[in-house]
Structure formats: structure tokens, C-alpha cells
Swiss-Prot record:
It comes from Bacillus subtilis (strain 168). The keyword Cell inner membrane does not apply. Its EC number is 6.1.1.5. SUPFAM superfamilies: Anticodon-binding domain of a subclass of class I aminoacyl-tRNA synthetases, Nucleotidylyl transferase, ValRS/IleRS/LeuRS editing domain. This is Isoleucine--tRNA ligase. Monomer. GO terms for cellular component: cytosol. Catalyzes the attachment of isoleucine to tRNA(Ile). As IleRS can inadvertently accommodate and process structurally similar amino acids such as valine, to avoid such errors it has two additional distinct tRNA(Ile)-dependent editing activities. One activity is designated as 'pretransfer' editing and involves the hydrolysis of activated Val-AMP. The other activity is designated 'posttransfer' editing and involves deacylation of mischarged Val-tRNA(Ile). A motif ('KMSKS' region) lies at residues 594-598. Coiled coil: none annotated. A motif ('HIGH' region) lies at residues 57-67. Keywords: Aminoacyl-tRNA synthetase, ATP-binding, Cytoplasm, Ligase, Nucleotide-binding, Protein biosynthesis. Belongs to the class-I aminoacyl-tRNA synthetase family. IleS type 1 subfamily.
């Protein structure tokens, strides 16, 4: 007979190869047909809620690695929470207004804006946004992200816009919204004001000039004709100069350079002299900054007054300690100008072109005017020094062009009135990483008022009317009416109708005796859109709650969505919209460089999924320290795929050895398991506790390493290795075999559930092959619970010591292999000469030690009986010889009793007995 037929070899239809790129779409199709999201929600509907609120990605273009990282992290949490006692809905969202969509449509002359009305152009923007959402939705679903994809929230949906209007109205009612002339970050290339979050810093080469302002009226402190030196890197703002700021507490020096007398901060005299090339100079006297107040200098180009003012913002970090002040072109300049009653002069238009308020430079683009202004200063003898520097300068994040500070009439949300409430709310929120708290605290503490208006077409209109006398009209009645109009018709109605048709019927206002009104043309900053989601989504949807348990986004969102959401929520509810905030870093290439098409180092999620599958991408996300920037490359993904293979093979081995196991009839009670099997259950319990704790603390790399290590170290290298001599060789119902299978069963169930949030496709694929489970998907189960093992501490301590001894045995076997004494470990006759403690340890182990060590022969003697060539270890001495006897054809174990049963000349007695009893017909 063929003895192979008598072996209980693994049987499984769970394939060895993942073939994920082909298999995952089928699994996802099945999820969709079953409506797995709804099934999970129904199963958990009576549990406490855990709401992770999706920060809406911008609906433009394909998803990149940053999107994948973000969405997968969210999915880990939502999937885990729904398997650990919570009802965890996930409603994905999209941010859909703003300049990138306008630009995408007008680029390459696809759409000619000038040939259509604003309303028509906005319709095209909306169509484009929906198309982008469709593309991104499919890509996000392909990642295996589970959510309410059929009912996402979208910032252009009428019901969303209606709620956004209510948020604006509530803030206006509380006095937080105002219109004012103020310098704002302005992008000439976009012709619009920008929020702080829309600015990025890049290096720029600029003129750096030192300019002298002659003293007109020295107030008895300075003498007429002495000259105050200012320093600036924006010569184009000199025509807007109305003053010079000095610090009240600084000391200022008058220095003589030839015939000239210059005034600079004493602490900067040497720097200025060096920069301006003053080889010889002398300090003639010093004065206190506060004594310079109200001195009048003369504008070097126009001869008008330039007032010396006191400002706390003046520093000695750079420059001269005398700060050129143009209230129309800087935040500090504006504030100090207000204090001293200066005009807000801004001689630059929305395109960045100098106006008639800058005589001599009218019609020039501001950057081109730099040269002309510098030349004129030189001609008038006011230019002390010109050089060029490269410095970090603000740029428009979309057009990548430089921005300027420019005073315009804008709508603002005043932060100062509720700043302390914002800071309190930050304190009450849980931040991961912890430094997030300080980061947002500092931003909120230092930020000015929020400019919420944009001079664009594609966005939510600012719902303000103007009376005949120019007074802005914002009342409960108008807000409610506009909100309702938007809910019914969408915000495009604002651009389709006249003001009178947008107001409540019969509306009157004292500022409009003739009953006529106009409407605001500006739209809201897109950060106001997404920042209103706590009201439009969390508060409005029945399946969600405000505050959310968690907001999770990239670290760029401290100044973006985390900030705008906090501002609007605290303004209208007094509380943060979130209980916790988690931030992640950016995805970089394998060398830690930013991904860019020009370098050719972009890793595209779609390509990774086509080649390796979504589960590999997800496993990569779980493997990285995502709170910092993360690296990804083909080589890194290859390593992750190797780990995946190991985990999958472990699943397959466990499953294959359960083909004849029915837990209802074959499972062994925990107290009846062999000790080594109990030991494995104890190790499994530790894994379960560790992994669940790691999920709870969002430490996914701990989950990844713990599962991987358990599969490779505890299972493959030990338990599953020696198992073969039992589960393949013994008869089906042998107690040792059923004992091991019981542990295989518990281990497989625990592993598939623990890995399900990270590897949902693989987990569900395996689940579909399990005959002993009732639920149709692993997603409809809960995380595994630990199993109580009697005397677990003593058993663990005992077998941990055994494992230390086993490590020494493996080293000794390896040495014997290198010395060609043996090939495989089954060729060994292992001779142990343990020390006293280990001799007692070995005596206490009831299991077959030859099996545990995977050797054919084993003897244990006193330590002092060891031969001279025995290897010494901390546990005792070990010698390895070649086992004597023949190899049993069935078990591959070398035995002296092979052929002892003449009916089976090639089998050992043990194997002959099994065959005769169970397989002989």
C-alpha cells in the first residue's frame, strides 16, 4: 500500500497565492451585493456610537498616496470599532467648491468664461465636481474602505449649503461677522483673497533695500535733516508708506557717516554699517525709542508726511529697528495705523497693478515696479543700499505664484471675541500626537481675524444684501429665507435671481426707503464650507452625532480643517466639534523625498493595487509610523508583500489542518489540552490583548508587528513545525491531534478577526472557506476574547524556560549541521546534559520531547557526564550525534525498530501500529 494515503495531510481550497488584484474586485462586488455596510450598521445599531467624521478630500483628480494613507487609517478605526462594541458609521464626504475646479474648466480654453453668465459657469463647475466625485469614489472603494458610499456628504448639495448659510447667520447674529478694509493675503494670479491655509512658502529672490527718510519735524529730539533708515524687501510698497515704527523700549543711535547723520537701533548699528558699506562711522548720540513718537519724516518720493509711531512688533532680528509702515500692505502696519489714525492706502489693484495712488508707477505690475521705484529712490538720494536676497516668501498654493498683502473690502469672522473659548476647547480635546494641542493652540492664539470672502464664482455666496444707503443687511429673516431657497434650489439661485427675488416677500429696511436692494457678489472661503460640516453633517444626519469622537487628517489640517471646524463650531455651539483629533504625516518616496512627477518618484495607489492588491497597500499603511512622514516605494511594498505571504501561509496551514475538525464534536476542553497546547493558547491570549490595546490606541504598527511575529516566531518556527509529526501522522481522533487542532481552530479564528480591519479582503476570503462559522462575513463578528487557561502563569513560566533551552538546542543542531554530522534535524540523536534546574524542567514536561525538538532520538543525562566535545550553554551541555537506525517511510523519523513488525518492513513500530489499526482494510 502507498503509505502517503494514510497521512492526514492538510486539505484546503484557500489558495496559497493571494492573486489580490483579480480576487479583491470580486470580494468587493459581493460586499456591495450583500450591502455589507448596512448589515454591519444593523447588527450594531443598539451599541454606543463611535463617529469618525470624514474630512472631505477635494473633488479634483485621481487619488494619490496621501489620500490612500488617510482613508485606510480611517477604515482601520471604523472597522475595528464596529467589531469591538460600537456602532461606527462612516459617511465619506467631498469638498467641491473653489478655484481648482474653476481653473480646471478654463485651462486650455476648454470653457470661455466671458461668453457665459456666472450661473451658467457655476453649472459647469458643478457637473465637473460630480464627475470627479464619481472617479474618486470608485478609487476609494477599491482601497477596501467601507462606508455609506451611496449617501456621502457633498459641500455643493443644497441641504449642505442651506446649513452653511445658517452657520454664517448664527455667527453674524452673535456679532462675529463684519466687513472691513483690511490687508489680506492676496493672490494677484487668482485675483482673490487667500486664507492662511491656502498659502505655502517657497524661496524667492527679492530686492533688499535700505532707504533714508529725512526728518521734517524732529520735535526737539532729532534734528531736521537727520535721516531715519528703514529696510524692506518689497520696494513696491514704498509708495504706500505713511509711517515708520520704532520700539518704545529700544535705544536708537544717531551715527555720522561723512556728512550724513543716520538713525538706527543701537543694537543693529554694526549690522547696518556692514550691510550698507559704512567703512567709517561714529555714534554721535543715543535716544530712547519712546522719545521718537510723533516725529515727522518726509516720504522720499512724494514729500508727504511719514509719522514715527511706537510699535511692540518692532524687533532687532533683522533690518534697522525702524520699520517701514504701509497700513494697506501689512497686518502689523494696519493695526498700528489704526491706532495712530492713518489712512489705509493701497495703490495696487486686484491684478497686482499699481494704481494712480502711486504716481509715477501707475499701470506697472507690482513686481516690475520694484526696479523703477528703486531707481527713483536712488535718483533722489534716498537709496542707501540695494542688494538681492533669496528668502522664504508666501505663494498661492494653487497657482504657485507669489502673494502680496493688500487692503481690500472683505468679510471677516472676528476670532478675538471668542478666542479664549477656542483655547479652552483645544484644551478639552484629546490630541494624538500630543504636540497637536500646542500646535493648534499657538495658531489660534496668534491668528488674526479670519477673512472669509473670496472674489470668485464657484462657491457658496455670502448671504448679505445691501440697502440703498449701502448698509449690509443680515437678519434672522433674510438668513432663514436664503437658507430655505438654497435647500430647495441650490445656491445657484443667488446668481440667477435679482436681490428682490431672493428676499422674503414684502421685506423692508429703513436703509432702503424705495424698497430696492443689491446683493453681495463675493463667495465664502472654502474652509468655511468644510468647516461647517459639524452642522451640515454631524448635526443633521440621524446616523451621526456632534461632537464627533474623532477627526483624522494630515498634519497640514491644523491650519486647515481642524482650525476652521473649531472656529465655526465654537462660534455657534460654544464647543469643539470633536472629542479627539489624530493627525498623520505625508507620504514620501523611499528616500524620504517629496513625490513629484518631474523626479519620477510618484507611487500611485491605483498602480499598486493593480500589481499587488489593496490588502498589500493597507498592510503597508499598518506597518509605518504614520504620525510622522512615511516612506513608500516599490522595494518597501515588496517587503510588505513578503510579510503578507507569511501571514497568508499561516492562515492556509491552520485551515488545511482543520479539514476533519468539527469544533462541536472534536474540540478538547481547555483543561484537558496538553500543556504545550495550553501554552500556545496563553501566547494567543497575550496577542489578543496586545493587538486590541494597540487598535484602541491607534498604534497600527504594533498590530502589524505583533501579528507578523506571532505567525513567524510562535507558530511557524515552533508550534506548527513540530505539529506535523502529530497532525499528519497520528490517527484522526488521537487526543494529541485533537488537542492541537483545538488550538489551531482558536488561533485561526482569532487571527482572522484581529487582522480583519487591516486585511479585509483576505480575512473575508478565508472566512468564506471556514465551514465552522455561521456569519456570512468576518465583518459581522466581534474581536476575539481571551480564553481562560488554568494555571496559566505556571505553565507560561515553565514553557518560556523550555523555549530558552530549545534555543540552545537549535544552536547545537545548527553547529552539527555545519560540521556535516547531520542534515535535517530528524537525523539527530540529541544528547542533553542539562544543569539541575533544566533537568527538573525537562522531567516535568509530559510531552514527547523528541517531537518538541524535532529529533529522532533523545537522551538526558547528568551534566557532569557530558563528553569533552559537548557544547556548553547557560542551560547545560549538549552533544549531537547521527541517529542510529532506519528512516520510517511514513513519518521520516529515524528509528531502531523500523521493520520490527514484519508486515510493515519500512515502518517503525509506532507507525505500523497506526496503519494496522486504522488503515488496514
Amino acid at each position: 500500500m502507498d503509505f502517503k494515503d494514510t497521512l492526514l495531510m492538510p486539505k484546503t481550497d484557500f489558495p496559497m497565492r493571494g492573486n489580490l488584484p483579480n480576487r479583491e474586485p470580486d470580494i468587493q462586488k459581493k460586499w456591495e451585493e450583500e450591502d455589507i455596510y448596512r448589515l454591519v450598521q444593523e447588527r450594531t445599531k443598539d451599541r454606543p456610537k463611535f463617529v469618525l467624521h470624514d474630512g472631505p478630500p477635494y473633488a479634483n483628480g485621481d487619488i494619490h498616496m496621501g489620500h490612500a494613507l488617510n482613508k485606510i487609517l480611517k477604515d482601520f478605526i471604523v472597522r475595528y470599532k464596529s467589531m469591538s462594541g460600537y456602532n461606527a458609521p462612516y459617511v465619506p464626504g467631498w469638498d467641491t467648491h473653489g478655484l481648482p475646479i474653476e481653473t480646471a474648466l478654463t485651462k486650455n480654453k476648454k470653457v470661455n468664461r466671458k461668453e457665459m453668465s456666472v450661473a451658467e459657469f457655476r453649472k459647469l463647475c458643478e457637473e465637473y465636481a460630480w464627475k470627479q466625485i464619481e472617479g474618486q469614489r470608485e478609487q476609494f472603494k477599491r482601497l477596501g474602505v467601507r462606508g455609506d458610499w451611496e449617501n456621502p456628504y457633498v459641500t455643493l448639495k443644497p441641504e449642505y449649503e442651506a446649513q452653511q448659510i445658517r452657520v454664517f447667520g448664527e455667527m453674524a447674529k452673535r456679532g462675529y461677522i463684519y466687513k472691513g478694509l483690511k490687508p489680506v493675503n492676496w493672490s494677484p494670479s487668482s485675483e482673490s483673497a487667500l486664507a492662511e491655509a491656502e498659502i505655502e512658502y517657497q524661496d524667492k529672490r527679492s530686492a533688499s533695500i535700505y532707504v533714508a527718510f529725512g526728518v521734517k519735524d524732529g520735535k526737539g529730539v532729532l534734528e531736521n535733516g537727520e535721516r531715519i533708515i528703514i529696510w524692506t524687501t518689497t520696494p513696491w510698497t514704498i509708495p504706500a508708506n505713511l509711517g515708520i515704527s520704532v520700539h518704545p523700549d529700544l535705544e536708537y543711535s544717531v551715527i555720522a557717516v561723512g556728512e550724513d547723520r543716520f538713525v538706527v537701533a543701537s543694537a543693529l548699528v554694526e549690522n547696518v554699517a556692514s550691510a550698507c558699506g559704512f567703512d567709517q562711522y561714529e555714534v554721535t548720540r543715543t535716544v530712547k525709542g519712546k522719545d521718537l513718537e510723533n516725529i515727522i519724516a518726509e516720504h522720499p518720493l512724494y514729500g508727504r508726511d511719514s509719522l514715527v509711531m511706537l510699535g511692540e512688533h518692532v524687533t532687532t532680528d533683522a533690518g534697522t529697528g525702524c520699520v517701514h509702515t504701509a497700513p494697506g500692505h501689512g497686518e502689523d502696519d494696519f493695526i498700528i495705523g489704526q491706532k495712530y489714525g492713518l489712512d489705509v492706502l493701497c495703490p495696487v489693484d486686484e491684478k497686482g497693478v499699481m494704481t494712480s495712488e502711486a504716481p509715477g508707477f501707475e499701470g506697472m505690475f507690482y513686481d516690475d515696479a520694484n526696479k523703477a521705484i528703486t531707481q527713483q529712490l536712488d535718483e533722489k538720494g534716498a537709496l542707501v543700499k540695494l542688494e538681492f536676497i533669496t528668502h522664504s516668501y508666501p505663494h498661492d498654493w494653487r497657482t504657485k505664484k507669489p502673494t502680496i498683502f493688500r487692503a481690500t473690502a472683505q468679510w471677516f469672522a472676528s476670532i478675538k471675541d471668542f478666542r479664549s473659548d477656542l483655547l479652552d476647547a483645544i484644551k478639552e480635546t484629546k490630541w494624538v500626537p500630543e504636540w497637536g494641542e500646542q500646535r493648534l493652540h499657538n495658531m489660534v492664539r496668534d491668528r488674526g481675524d479670519w477673512c472669509i470672502s473670496r472674489q470668485r464664482a464657484w462657491g457658496v455666496p455670502i448671504p448679505v444684501f445691501y440697502a440703498e444707503n449701502g448698509e449690509p443687511v443680515i437678519t434672522d429673516e433674510t438668513i432663514e429665507h436664503v437658507s430655505e431657497l438654497f435647500r430647495q434650489h441650490g445656491s445657484n439661485i443667488w446668481f440667477e435671481k435679482e436681490a428682490k427675488d431672493l428676499l422674503p416677500e414684502g421685506f423692508t429696511h429703513p436703509g432702503s426707503p424705495n424698497g430696492t436692494f443689491t446683493k453681495e457678489q463675493d463667495i465664502m472661503d472654502v474652509w468655511f464650507d468644510s468647516g461647517s460640516s459639524h452642522q451640515a453633517v454631524l448635526e443633521e444626519r440621524d446616523d451621526l452625532v456632534r461632537p464627533a469622537d474623532l477627526y483624522l487628517e494630515g498634519s497640514d489640517q491644523y491650519r486647515g480643517w481642524f482650525n476652521s471646524s473649531l472656529s465655526t463650531a465654537v462660534a455657534v455651539t460654544g464647543k469643539a466639534p470633536y472629542k479627539g483629533v489624530l493627525s498623520h504625516g505625508f507620504a514620501l518616496d523611499g528616500e524620504g523625498r517629496k513625490m513629484s512627477k518631474s523626479i519620477g518618484n510618484v507611487v500611485v495607489p491605483a498602480k499598486v493595487m493593480k500589481q499587488l492588491g489593496a490588502d498589500i497597500l493597507r498592510l503597508w499603511v499598518s506597518s509605518v509610523d504614520y504620525q510622522a512622514d512615511v516612506r513608500v516605494s516599490d522595494a518597501i511594498l515588496k517587503q510588505v508583500a513578503e510579510v503578507y505571504r507569511k501571514i497568508r501561509n499561516t492562515f492556509r496551514f491552520l485551515h488545511g489542518n482543520l479539514f476533519d475538525f468539527d469544533p462541536k464534536t472534536n474540540a478538547v476542553a481547555v483543561e484537558d489540552l496538553r500543556e504545550v497546547d495550553q501554552y500556545m493558547l496563553i501566547k494567543l491570549n497575550k496577542l489578543i490583548d496586545k493587538v486590541k490595546k494597540a487598535y484602541d490606541e491607534y498604534e497600527f504598527a504594533v498590530v502589524y508587528h505583533s501579528i507578523h511575529n506571532f505567525c513567524t516566531i510562535e507558530l511557524s518556527s515552533f508550534y506548527l513545525d513540530f505539529a506535523k509529526d502529530i497532525v499528519y501522522i497520528e490517527h484522526a481522533d488521537h487526543p494529541d491531534r485533537r488537542s492541537m487542532q483545538t488550538v489551531f481552530y482558536e488561533t485561526l479564528l482569532a487571527l482572522v478577526k484581529l487582522s480583519a480591519p487591516i486585511l479585509p479582503h483576505t480575512a473575508d476570503e478565508l472566512w468564506s472557506h471556514l465551514t465552522f462559522v455561521e456569519e456570512q462575513s468576518v465583518q459581522l463578528t466581534d474581536m476575539p476574547e481571551t480564553i481562560t487557561v488554568p494555571n496559566s502563569e505556571a505553565t507560561e513560566e515553565k514553557f518560556d524556560r523550555f523555549m530558552a533551552l530549545r534555543d540552545d538546542v537549535l544552536k547545537a543542531l545548527e553547529t552539527a549541521r555545519n560540521e556535516k554530522i547531520i542534515g535535517k534535524s530528524l537525523e539527530a540523536n540529541l544528547k542533553l546534559y542539562p544543569n539541575k534546574e533544566n533537568k527538573e524542567l525537562l522531567a516535568s514536561i509530559k510531552e514527547n520531547l523528541s517531537q518538541l525538538f524535532i529529533v529522532s532520538e533523545l537522551t538526558i543525562s547528568e551534566e557532569n557526564e557530558a563528553p569533552n566535545d559537548a557544547q556548553s550553554f547557560a542551560t547545560g551541555k549538549i552533544a549531537v550525534e547521527k541517529a542510529e537506525g532506519e528512516m520510517c517511510e511514513r513519518s521520516r523519523v529515524i528509528s531502531k525498530d523500523v521493520g520490527a513488525n514484519p508486515k510493515y518492513p519500512t515502518l517503525s513500530l509506532r507507525n505500523a501500529e497506526i496503519v494496522e489499526k486504522y488503515y488496514q482494510k
